Amino acid sequence: MIIKRLNFSCRLFSTASTSTSYEKTPIQPATKCLQLAVIGAPNVGKSLLTNSLIRCPLSAVSSKMDTTTRNISASICSDSTQLVFVDSPGAVSTSHVRQTMKKTSATSGDRVLQDPERALQRAQHVLVVQDSTAPGAYIHHRVLHMLHRYSHVPSILVMNKIDLVMRRSDLLPLVEILTNGQLSDNQQISTKPAQIGRLGKSLSTNIQSSSSFKPSDEKWQSQFRELIQKPTWKCSYSETRSLFRTICGWSGFERVFFVSSLNGEGIDELRDHLMSISPQGEWKMQDGMPTGESAQQLCIDSIRAAVLDTTPSDVAYTVQIRISEWEEQGEVLQIVGEIRCQKPRDGSLIIGKGGKRISEIGRRVNEHLHSLFQRQLYARLIVTHNGKLITQSK
């Protein structure tokens, strides 16, 4: 195994207006910084949204749930202002972590469960990401629980994936439900009758929002007081689902933004707004380096995302990935990534007939890393079981 600790600086995005090194430039009183938590249900596009906001493909993304398994900090600087985003895992249950993600040990699953709330603990603002095409008009009950626990932190509702919505007018009545018909400044949201739901599919309107739901039942009030004192990850999935089963929205949103993280629609407006509300403060991250993550960890994330996108879930979630070689050869960074499988047949499945699947995984990884690091590199992937190399599909 060869891993050299190189002075490897990923040439990631940096705005042109900040031309000098952050380390060489003392913090000025006029600098501004806003720390944001990006939270939401699984697979709503939190990572792609973060990438779009920082103009860098930092977080690995895939079409599968649970691509992000820990908090990832990312930043962007413009003039004297820095935005620091914490992209968090989707809010899931303990059983999901064990059964779907195949994380059976307490330590391996802890970050998936706890990191969404950890992202909120130091946040000055919250971005709640909602899939505009998702069936059902409600904010996920785990997200609602966190919003109630951190109600003192200002929040923004981000309606993502609007490029997939056939009729944009459908979004207004949906947002009315998700915001309880108003924003935190008591501004009313006016709408007209329209169908809502996945791509225009009509949805039953016998829904009760939390603004009209005023529980008088002492049992409910007692349950609320008890659960709101506990971190979300310490509440069972059934507890939060039962608590918020008739509550669909959150009245505390300051603003609502409609965006497409895929094609960039609405992203500039959201970023500009966040820049405009940033308070004075010292920058938290180095200018020109939008993350504190190591290059090796970003490579592992990229390989995992490519495996998730190309391999059946029952195999993809069980593999372990490590970097076995990371070495400069001239101007080219040579990387060897090892995909460790639980069973030999899993390795054969990942390699695919004639090596087609592993070739596709490698193509995706190299394409992403080249875009991320902006330098010459080559990532070679090997598949192993119990330390033995699997060379072909059987």
Curated annotation (Swiss-Prot):
Residues 40-47 are annotated as: G1. The keyword Membrane applies. Residues 160-163 are annotated as: G4. One of its GO terms (biological process) is regulation of aerobic respiration. Residues 32-280 form the Era-type G domain. Keywords: GTP-binding, Membrane, Mitochondrion, Mitochondrion inner membrane, Nucleotide-binding. Pfam families: MMR_HSR1. Residues 66-70 are annotated as: G2. CDD domains: Era (cd04163), KH-II_Era (cd22534). SUPFAM superfamilies: P-loop containing nucleoside triphosphate hydrolases (SSF52540), Prokaryotic type KH domain (KH-domain type II) (SSF54814). Residues 87-90 are annotated as: G3. One of its GO terms (cellular component) is mitochondrial inner membrane. It is a peripheral membrane protein. Disruption phenotype: RNAi-mediated knockdown abolishes fertilized egg production and there is no egg laying, but animals do produce oocytes. RNAi-mediated knockdown causes a 25% decrease in the rate of oxygen consumption suggesting decreased mitochondrial respiration. InterPro entries: G_ERA_dom, GTP-bd, GTPase_Era-like, KH_dom-like_a/b, KH_sf_prok-type, P-loop_NTPase, Small_GTP-bd. GTP binds at residues 40-47, 87-91, 160-163. Residues 259-261 are annotated as: G5. It is found in: Mitochondrion matrix; Mitochondrion inner membrane. GO terms for molecular function: GTP binding; ribosomal small subunit binding; rRNA binding. Disulfide bonds: none annotated. NCBIfam families: small_GTP. Probable GTPase that plays a role in the mitochondrial ribosomal small subunit assembly. Specifically binds the 12S mitochondrial rRNA (12S mt-rRNA) to a 33 nucleotide section delineating the 3' terminal stem-loop region. May act as a chaperone that protects the 12S mt-rRNA on the 28S mitoribosomal subunit during ribosomal small subunit assembly. May play a role in positively regulating mitochondrial function. Plays a role in fertility. Belongs to the TRAFAC class TrmE-Era-EngA-EngB-Septin-like GTPase superfamily. Era GTPase family. This is GTPase Era, mitochondrial. It comes from Caenorhabditis elegans. The lineage of its organism: Eukaryota, Metazoa, Ecdysozoa, Nematoda, Chromadorea.
